[in-house]
Amino acid sequence: MRYIRLCIISLLATLPLAVHASPQPLEQIKLSESQLSGRVGMIEMDLASGRTLTAWRADERFPMMSTFKVVLCGAVLARVDAGDEQLERKIHYRQQDLVDYSPVSEKHLADGMTVGELCAAAITMSDNSAANLLLATVGGPAGLTAFLRQIGDNVTRLDRWETELNEALPGDARNTTTPASMAATLRKLLTSQRLSARSQRQLLQWMVDDRVAGPLIRSVLPAGWFIADKTGAGERGARGIVALLGPNNKAERIVVIYLRDTPASMAERNQQIAGIGAALIEHWQR
């Protein structure tokens, strides 16, 4: 009988390890920083209330990289709502307007693309020329920064065009945000009256349709979970993702993760972001 009790006690002692194979989110972030020899910035925010659930370096500046394209298309949709733009408007451009990594726009030199098609290309495929063409419609980097100030984001700033904005120089405040500011801005775009309900649905759908985020949080997403995201990559180890996540196919939380100043390879950076995502998912009910 005593032997049986000892076996049961031993079994119970192993259960927490079996239930939670991943570290707690903050533990995973600290581990990622150590393994990357760089900096990680992260915030997990409740979508409905705006309450911060987890944060690490949330008020430090990180390069936005291509995650700015979500905010850009939010600014475009705000112009649509105001009657100053139409998603169906066709924009024509030339070969000299194309920059590196333009997998969609480079195929439409002859016929051009609509504003809506450019937003879809910028978010779902991270098309850089599409982003520049859209930036021109909102007044360039300064115009997008002005839009951010209008909606109450006094931190995030865009100063350059694609692809120079991805330089990620140490100590350079240009083209940066903080995890907290990016999460708050994304929440405003998707839940407040800054955008119409129709435009909110459209912005979210473009993020749902993201086709270049596979190696990151999507790689560890359980069946039945919701995700809508936009990634970014830059020089000097910069990598990032802004995402909406939740079980039961429902967007419950905003997750923003940025990396910078790491010598790690792209595959290693992707793996670390996926690991942080896995820790968040495994410890969702905290």
Curated annotation (Swiss-Prot):
SHV enzymes hydrolyze broad spectrum cephalosporins notably cefotaxime and ceftazidime. Residues 1-21 form the signal peptide. It catalyses: a beta-lactam + H2O = a substituted beta-amino acid. The class A beta-lactamase family has a specific amino-acid numbering system, sometimes called Ambler or ABL numbering and often misspelt as Amber. A multiple sequence alignment was used to derive a consensus sequence and then the consensus was numbered taking into account insertions and deletions. This allows use of identical numbers, e.g. for active site residues, despite differences in protein length. UniProt always uses natural numbering of residues, hence there appear to be differences in numbering between this entry and some papers. Disulfide bonds join 73-119. Substrate binds at residues 230-232. Its EC number is 3.5.2.6. Pfam families: Beta-lactamase2 (PF13354). The keyword Hydrolase applies. Belongs to the class-A beta-lactamase family. GO terms for molecular function: beta-lactamase activity. InterPro entries: Beta-lactam/transpept-like, Beta-lactam_cat, Beta-lactam_class-A, Beta-lactam_class-A_AS. The gene is bla. This is Beta-lactamase SHV-8. GO terms for biological process: beta-lactam antibiotic catabolic process; response to antibiotic. Keywords: Antibiotic resistance, Disulfide bond, Hydrolase, Signal. The active site is at residues 66, 164.
